[in-house]
Amino acid sequence: MHFGQFNLMGYRERGTPTQRLFHEAREQTKLAEEAGFEIAWFAEHHFSNYCVCPSPLMMVAHCAAVTNRIKLAPAVVVMPLYSPARLIAEIGMADGLSDGRLILGIGSGYQPYEFERFGAELSSSKSQTEELMDMVELAFSKETFSYNGSHYQLPETHISAQPVNGMPEIWIAGDSEDIHKIAVKRGYTPMFAGRMHGVDYIVEQRNRLESSFKSAGKDTSELAFGVQRFLCVTESREETFQYLDNCRHQMRLASALRRREEVLNGAMMNEIPMPDEISLEEMSKHLLVGDVETIAERLTNEISKARPSHIMFHLQVGGSSYQLALKSIELFASEIKPLVEKVLGPLEEFGISTIEK
């Protein structure tokens, strides 16, 4: 299995320069490469402080110029918000600029607020995503192609910007049965967020994935999937709870956007407590926060029980410390991972990885 670093690029203080957030994401990506992380992930969201990155493919292209080895990936391209021909060409260009290091993370979207402002239909987003992926696969396997779907039509077309090694590896985000079915049918790697939950939730999601794959007659002994986890390495209780407060902030915004209950004051979303919200103290008991030994023990438990092929760490959340995020990357590589490997052995040999070297 392998590890990644996730960049949401949100902010909590009004007037935060977006340029700073882009630069901090870039520097975390560079450090993640030095620390041996396998993938750097970049989110896409629009129209609020929840996330200031409207184009993860632009972040891929930018970070490709300052890195050499690390894979670069949207998490995710919100497919129905794009014009098909332009999106496909930009995927090909991003892969070329990164010398074939693109992993294409896709999603169908979940925020009505975004879809309304793009004039897009959230109700048909999953079927739109499938049609768009039909077109991507045709564009990168044939010199020319045409398409006549329920949502999209394209006359005979050549996409000139082609990926280095043909079709990029595809990961798909979401925990619904519909997303599972797409992953099974197309051979994509599913990924989901662990949110504020502990290992039991991740195991439950793995079991749901296994059920979907088994229903389709697929072998689940080598099931590959990715999970996103919060990570903050510190011996300070104050820093731990400041970080957890920012995790809760981010989850509150996401929950409000999902439920269509967002309230904005200009660019800033108001924080609305989630239904059945757990306390920061409870969060501290099962998230990957705290000192090196605590995190290593919890991570070992999560890996051994849930057996993910990839874990992406969300290190800088809301208004949490950039410097603490950098420190956490370094301590994960130098101290936490070796402690986990003392118990589980070399993690590159543990479980299943879909990532090609």
What is each residue range found by the language model?
Residues M1-V66, I70-L72, M167-P168, F350-E356:
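N-terminal beta1-alpha1-beta2 module of alpha/beta enzyme domains
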Residues F3, G36, E44, C63, ...:
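Conserved, mostly hydrophobic/aromatic
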Residues S124-I159, D200-P308, E341-K357:
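An alpha-helical appendage that flanks or caps ligand/catalytic pockets
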Residues C53-P74, Q128, E330-V343:
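Alpha-helix-loop-beta-strand connector modules within alpha/beta enzyme cores
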Residues F3-Q5, A40-F42, L72-P74, L102-I106, ...:
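Hydrophobic faces of well-ordered beta-strands that scaffold small-molecule active sites
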Residues M9-F22, V77-A85, V164-G174, C232, ...:
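Active-site mouth loops of central-metabolism enzymes
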Residues I39-C63, V78, Y110, G194-H197, ...:
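Glycine-rich, proline-tolerant flexible connector loops at the mouths of alpha/beta enzymes
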Residues H2-R20, P80-S146, T189-V203:
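Flexible, glycine-rich active-site loops centered on histidine and acidic residues
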